[in-house]
């Protein structure tokens, strides 16, 4: 099917042609003929890189241009939202406005009403539904990317509830990797089902075992080791993507591979890699990353900072980095294809010990093999060490992906959603709640809601007992102020209960370590883990701070290993946050507490939200005397600063280090800086021309500074 055959606005056709698209892949053509341009719901289950997103783009833009209204594109990750935001910019050329919404769950974000296409994470859109944002009534089409994540234990319920709310109110398009029960999901959504295994680049799959790769067609190739699979790809001027099961392993394997890979590179390639390595900020994780990059290999995992993850992804796509060793986070929708994908580990650690990686995840990883426009064939290879290679082949290569199951019955998910139905959607009886539940994927799969009804009644009792709701003699449910605020804050009611229970102690002795320990014990945060080696030091620090904590010694009721671990994981997290707000350099925090930069940012983002939520719950409970203290602490958490730097944080391009440099140089307020001359600020370490120009523009003064080298620097001395 050619673009010219498409019965859509000419502006859509011209935009596609500007991208170099003249015709559609077979599954794209099938989807576009299925009725989605006429408003039918659709579930599109096709392989990675087969053009799922483009189908959704055309449907969204066509709907907006023909019927008005808005389109919402739901993604699972902030990084994916950023990627799609960049991709969708093309549509601004024809007059559509594109926006991205992630984070800040306590806002209606009415500004989004000015936009036509809104990209949001599932959690963000769920929070907007709870806040009753006025523009949501104008949403005519909703796309759920990675819809198979409805089966995710952590986040599936959120996506399911969004879809249940929007069914019948907007056209729904689900984009999915291959799943085991697409018919079931499509029937629930009342959607046309498009399933295909067609790929733009042929995928050749095999299993490596004891020096041989056995391909799915029965042919065999010899390789001396699994590492040789990487070196062979690089000799062919191709890239390799290796998946392992742990972060530390990703780092170790990347460093080991880089030693050999470097010998396969040209001098210009090594020069480009050295420049890349030199651009990284200094911290212990980045030191390892820089060392690996100098040898042409990088590692990628959630512990890396955002800038480092983007740097690795972009330079791997460009071919500067030759191989990437990653944990499966990289397979979650981010666009990083490679000629050869190697799955080094098919087992991973879980809460229940070692378990096999699901088939659906392995298929997603293997699906990254083959770069459209560059490769005629992509190769996906599973490394089998102790497992029977024939069984691995049958299970993963020829096996059918697992069925998806609703996660709505998970108690934490259900608790939050039941309160939201009462507090923000006006449901006032058990029957009304059950009627909503009857429209969910859970009810569709189970065919009855009896087992869920008992859980819902238990949740209602919990909400009643803890003053989130009240129930009249006529069994009418009414939300109380605590329930309404909790639902809109987008926190677990159990978190709000913990805040309520400890509020008196917080008011009596407000202190950072106590508050950080409290929020780190809530179900809304995943605290840092610790090793046996760290435990002794954590115990020592605990005795230093125990009088400032709001929770008793975990051993007070006898030894319980689960409670001990929970308590000290929260305590370690509190120590990291305390170091962060006391301006301890990131590298020192990484080294002292054995954490990664990406994890620090994740914890900081969540902690800021929970301190804000604690402040809001304090208002509801009338504890106004600590509101200002908590707001100050929230700002300190956000920026990682001591209190005296807060006034300087409103300056553009000024983070924690530049603010400290300004303060230590005598510029302690906005007024001090407004009276300074540009050359005075330029003398301060870390303050460059762009920063000074931005600061003065913020102050309403236009200053242009010619970029001259600073004569005091060693760099200038060496060049002169």
UniProtKB/Swiss-Prot annotation:
Induction comment from the UniProt entry of this chain: Constitutively expressed (at protein level).
Residues bound to ATP: 23, 28, 46-53
Species in which this protein is naturally found: Pyrococcus furiosus (strain ATCC 43587 / DSM 3638 / JCM 8422 / Vc1)
Gene3D superfamilies on file: 1.10.3380.30, 5' to 3' exonuclease, C-terminal subdomain, P-loop containing nucleotide triphosphate hydrolases
Statement: the UniProt record of this protein carries the keyword Cell membrane: no
MF terms (GO), sorted A to Z: 3'-5' DNA helicase activity; ATP binding; ATP hydrolysis activity; DNA binding
Catalytic activity, EC: 5.6.2.4
Start and end residues of each Helicase C-terminal domain: 229-422
Similarity comment: family membership: Belongs to the helicase family. Hel308 subfamily.
Gene Ontology biological process terms in this record: DNA repair
Protein name: ATP-dependent DNA helicase Hel308
Record-linked InterPro entries: DEAD/DEAH_box_helicase_dom, Hel308-like_dom4, Hel308_SKI2-like, Helicase_ATP-bd, Helicase_C-like, Helicase_Hel308, Hlx-hairpin-Hlx_DNA-bd_motif, P-loop_NTPase
Names of required cofactors: Mg(2+); Zn(2+)
Catalytic activity: Couples ATP hydrolysis with the unwinding of duplex DNA by translocating in the 3'-5' direction; ATP + H2O = ADP + phosphate + H(+)
Alphabetical UniProt keywords: ATP-binding, DNA damage, DNA repair, DNA-binding, Helicase, Hydrolase, Isomerase, Nucleotide-binding
Root EC class: isomerase
PANTHER family with a match to the protein in the record: ATP-DEPENDENT DNA HELICASE HEL308, DNA POLYMERASE THETA, PUTATIVE (AFU_ORTHOLOGUE AFUA_1G05260)-RELATED
Encoding gene per record: hel308
Subunit structure: Monomer. Interacts with PCNA.
